[in-house]
Amino acid sequence: MRTMKNLTLLALLLLTVAVVAQTPLPQGVPGPNIPRGKAPEQGYVPDGWPAHPGSLMKYSVEIRFGEEPESMPEGMKFGRVSAVTTDAQGNVYVFKRDAKTDQLVVFDSKGKYLRSWGKGMFTRPHGLRTDRDQNVWALDDAGHQVFKFTREGKLLQTWGVKDKPGNDAKTFNRPTDIAWDSQGNAYISDGYGNRRVVKLDKAGTFVATWGTEGDGPGQFRLPHSIAVDANDRVYVSDRENNRIQIFDTGGNLLTTWTHLGCTQGMYISPKNEMWIVTHRNNTENVTYDTLAGQVMKIDVESGKILGSMESPGHMLTATPAGIVYVASLTGNVFKWQPDPWWPARAHEAIARGVPPPK
């Protein structure tokens, strides 16, 4: 009898998982001219979404860096983790806020500690990116600086003046993230203080800036993350305004997405695949990093949500193989691995008496 009940439960679980994973949920993709008040008529809620917009992605967590496995040197801990990036060899770079030990820590893809640097160098780590030449860029928002390193940790360039916020061509005020266009120009979301985007050429020479504080077109309340797609469109996560604004490389506003909630971090791959980590709205985001957060895969042309999964997160990156790394202020980096056998794992849930992995 017990065996029959288990088999019945297994069948129901598998059916439920299959339906959720394969059936897209209703959603609308608003354009820039759809008023927020009209949004429900268009098929979506501006500051909310179903449990899994688009479709539930078949991913599972393979590793939680900093916990599974625990391979860091004795005495080293993450504290809050602000950002993560990878290099061409698949190594994982973690930017952590605990300043008692090195704040930039490198692992291999299986979580083995490789090296680290930057003890006491950063006031408040924020963004971390790898450029096409495999240099590592770190943004210290409270120190008002942007650093360029080799993968081994050699400092190559420093932009901004330490502990001196400003809004001219050579200073920042709490910069948050960096991205590059096809010509190698850098775009910095600057940030908590200036509420602007700064464009620099590949040598670090000031080119242009745009944006002021506010909620109008082209204004920002907090440009928290930035990304550039294959067509050189510049995406700015205007987090406190619950929107993503998209510009050309000259700072001209092209369109605005208001259906993705309070976006924390964005990443657009060389293959033009877009990933975000987001919350429904600022009320939810005040906790900074909760299980209410979602990682979403987005169509860069339309803004359509292609799939999602629940995950706490602050910043994220992805590999060409589709592995997603999410940096969490809870003190982890989650490695989300595509899992073709995900629905079949329901039997493990029955054996352990817990729901199947999400």
Regions found by a protein language model. Give the residues of each.
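Bacterial N-terminal signal peptides
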Residues: 8-18
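Bacterial N-terminal signal peptides that target proteins for export
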Residues: 1-9
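Eukaryotic scaffold repeat domains enriched in small/polar residues
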Residues: 22-358
